[in-house]
Curated annotation (Swiss-Prot):
The gene is recF. Transmembrane segments: none annotated. Pfam families: SMC_N. This is DNA replication and repair protein RecF. Signal peptide: none annotated. GO terms for molecular function: ATP binding; single-stranded DNA binding. PANTHER family: DNA REPLICATION AND REPAIR PROTEIN RECF (PTHR32182:SF0). InterPro entries: DNA-binding_RecF, DNA-binding_RecF_CS, P-loop_NTPase, RecF/RecN/SMC_N, RecF_2. Belongs to the RecF family. Keywords: ATP-binding, Cytoplasm, DNA damage, DNA repair, DNA replication, DNA-binding, Nucleotide-binding, SOS response. ATP binds at G30, E31, N32, A33, Q34, G35, K36, T37. It comes from Oceanobacillus iheyensis (strain DSM 14371 / CIP 107618 / JCM 11309 / KCTC 3954 / HTE831). It is found in: Cytoplasm. GO terms for cellular component: cytoplasm.
Length: 369
């Protein structure tokens, strides 16, 4: 899988751009605020139909324009496929092979992308919602129906929280509607949790040996899922649903008192351990970086296992931040298999042999040469 070419219209600081890429390594060089990260972001949006940098889609549109458009042509399973994302103040539309997709969840997965940027260290050391979002985005790539159930879950969760706020103000009100919304919430929560458990087992399978290799066999990585209910990871959705039913019955009064939902996938977390110690709390910066890198490299192999083709890798201002050993391990892992985009302010710190193999692009004020 690789991107043959990309066209941008009214996107961020790009008025109009058409660019063809090498199917192996592409290095994008530019000073800060010139547009190199915007170019990487556009590839990400082409995959996920959303930005990793902002939830406000109007920021993707040039300030004096009323729309932005990202068009890409990808090679997937030996076929050349055109993709398009159009963004307006009213929302987004996605096309595959010139056919508009009725739901964005039908589009996600059309092209698979793994991004590694400095902020990805927050997967290890940041807040729980960052790790939940990581799981949701990666699962959505390999299981498009996951996105549907996630959207339905979030919709019902919002309705349920609104009702709990009302019941908080009027605690003696009828709770029949709460039971209806609880059943709907459990239906989607059970599917999400079951699929997260399956995904986590695959992530462990790939991340643990990668981490051992990067750490020169000195460290053992463990990944633990921390749910809001007591449930084993081998439980199916029916068993998970039954446990949720008992949990919500148990916390019903407390939820009404607090006016919010106290259980569900939206309250879960991932915990990373290295040699038995929580990396978030006790890990060195080097261990945190190794853990983040191991997870990203594991994603590449996991997508290949599930989809049958390697994803596209985006290394946004991160390669020069890795020491020589970690950089070598990363490049040796992906060499010849993965189309890679590297953005950097300077080629210093990037392996000479990598630059020799790469197509170089220089970005200045939204113009690529």
């Amino acid at each position: 899988m690789h991107i043959e070419k990309l066209e941008l219209t009214n996107y961020r600081n790009y008025d109009q751009l058409e660019i063809a890429f090498d199917d192996q390594i592409n290095v994008i060089i530019g000073e800060n605020a010139q547009g190199k990260t915007n170019l990487m972001e556009a590839i990400y949006v082409l995959s996920f139909a959303r930005s990793h940098r902002t939830p406000r889609e109007k920021e993707l549109i040039q300030w004096d324009k009323d729309y932005a458009k990202i068009e890409g042509r990808i090679t997937k399973r030996n076929q050349s496929i055109p993709l398009q994302i159009s963004i307006t103040s009213k929302g987004k539309k996605a096309k595959v092979n010139h056919l508009e997709q009725h739901r964005l969840s039908d589009y996600i997965g059309s092209v698979n992308v793994v991004m590694f940027a400095p902020e990805d260290l927050t997967i290890v050391k940041g807040a729980p919602q960052i790790r939940r979002r990581f799981m949701d985005m990666e699962l959505g790539q390999i299981q498009p129906t996951y996105i549907y159930h996630l959207a339905q879950y979030q919709k019902v969760l919002k309705q349920r929280n609104h009702l709990l706020k009302q019941l908080q103000r009027k605690p003696n009100s009828d709770t029949t509607m709460l039971e209806v919304l609880t059943d709907q919430l459990i239906e989607h929560a059970s599917i999400l949790l079951e699929r997260r458990f399956i995904y986590l087992e695959l992530l462990r399978k790939w991340a643990q040996p990668i981490h051992r290799g990067i750490s020169r066999e000195l460290e053992q990585l463990e990944i633990q899922y921390s749910p809001s209910i007591e449930v084993s990871e081998d439980a199916n959705k029916e068993k998970i649903g039954n446990i949720y039913q008992m949990k919500f019955a148990e916390v019903k009064q407390k939820e009404i008192e607090r006016g919010t939902t106290l259980a569900g996938p939206h309250r879960d977390d991932l915990i990373f351990f290295v040699n038995g110690k929580d990396v978030q709390t006790y890990g060195s910066q080097g261990q945190q970086r190794t853990t983040a890198l191991s997870i990203k490299l594991a994603e590449i192999e996991l997508i290949y296992q599930e989809v049958g083709e390697y994803p596209i890798l985006l290394l946004d201002d991160v390669l020069s931040e890795l020491d020589d050993y970690r950089q070598s391990h990363l490049l040796n892992t992906i060499q010849g298999k993965v189309q890679t985009f590297v953005s950097t302010t300077s080629v210093e710190g990037i392996h000479h042999e990598t630059l020799q193999q790469a197509e170089l692009f220089r970005v200045t004020d939204g113009v690529v040469n």
